[in-house]
Swiss-Prot record:
Reported function: As well as its role in the urea cycle, may be involved in tissue remodeling.
Xref: PROSITE patterns: ARGINASE_1, ARGINASE_2
Xref: InterPro entries: Arginase (IPR014033), Ureohydrolase (IPR006035), Ureohydrolase_dom_sf (IPR023696), Ureohydrolase_Mn_BS (IPR020855)
Protein name according to UniProt: Arginase, non-hepatic 1
GO molecular-function terms, A-Z: arginase activity; manganese ion binding
Subunit structure of this chain's protein: Homotrimer.
Principal EC category: hydrolase
SUPFAM superfamilies, sorted: Arginase/deacetylase
Record has Metal-binding as a keyword: yes
Amino acid sequence: MSIRSNFVRLLKKQVSIIKLQKKCSHSVAVIGAPFSKGQKRRGVEHGPAAIRSAGLIERLSNLGCNVCDFGDLHFSQVPNDELYNSIVKHPRTVGLACKVLAEEVSKAVGAGHTCVTLGGDHSLAFGSITGHAQQCPDLCVIWVDAHADINTPLTTPSGNLHGQPVSFLLRELQDKVPPIPGFSWAKPCLSKSDIVYIGLRDLDPAEQFILKNYDISYYSMRHIDCMGIKKVMEKTFDQLLGRRDRPIHLSFDIDAFDPALAPATGTPVIGGLTYREGVYITEEIHNTGMLSAVDLVEVNPVLAATSEEVKATANLAVDVIASCFGQTREGAHTRADTIIDVLPTPSTSYESDNEEQVRI
C-alpha cells in the first residue's frame, strides 16, 4: 500500500473520529425527582430508582455521553397542605417541589448539560420546564402523553396537579389560572405556539375546549394512525423549528405508550404508541441536534402486576432516553476504536499457507 493511500486512509479515520466525538459528546445531567403528590397513587416516587436499576447511567455512558448524576432530590411535605377550592390536592407541596426542581434544572442547563429529569409524576414538568426556560427563554416543548395535562385549577375534575402543569406554563391561559398557594414564585414561560402534543387519546371536556379554542397544536393517536409518525414529526418540527433553531424540551410520559408495553404506570389508556412510534419520535428529536432537556415521568413500579412488568416498563424508559442521545435501532457503535472504514483483506502469506495446506 502506497504512502499516499496510507495517509488518505488515516485522514479518513481521523475525520470519522472527529465526527463521532461531535455526535456523541453530550454532557448529560441526570436528576432524580422521586415525587408523587401531584396525583393520588403511591409508587411513582420509585420511578427514578426503577429507571436507574434498568441501567440508564451505563447505557448513556456506553453511548459516549459524559454523565453527571445529580442524584435524587429531596422533596418536603408541607404540613397542613389544605385543598385549594375544595378540590386541588397538595398545592403547596407540589409548588415547592416544582420550585426545587426548577432551581436544579436551571443549574444543570446553565452548566452546559443536557438535563434528564426522572419522575415522579408529571406535575414536575412545570418545574423542569420553568428551570430550563430560565436559561433558554426561547425553548420549545414536545409533550408526548396520553393526556394533555392542561386542566386549570378551576376545571380539573380530579384535583390532581399532574393533570394541570401546562395551564400554568402558557401565557395565554394566565387569566384562567388563579393564584393558588405554593405557586406565587411561578411565572408562565411558554406561548401556545411553543408546544406540540403527540399521542393524545384521553382528554377531559375542558381540555378539549382549551386545545380547540386556543389553537394549540396536537397529534392524537388518530392523527398518528392517519398520517403516520413520520409526517407527525415533520409537521412538529415545521412548527417549532421552521423559522429558527432553538432548544427542545421533551416531556415524555410513559403512558404515551400502549399499556401492553408500559403496564407499570398510573393512568394507562389502551391504544397508545407502539415501540417503533415512540422511539422514532426520540430518534428524530436527537437528529435535530437541538435537544436540551428531557423529562421521563410516571413510571410506577408498585402498580405492576409482576416484576417482569416493572422491568419491561423501566427498560422502555431507558430506551426512550437512550434514543434521545444517539442510540439507534441499527446499533450504536460509538467508541472510536470500533469505527470501521475499510474491510480487512487476507494477507499474501495467509493465502500461501492455505494453498500449501490444500496441496498436502
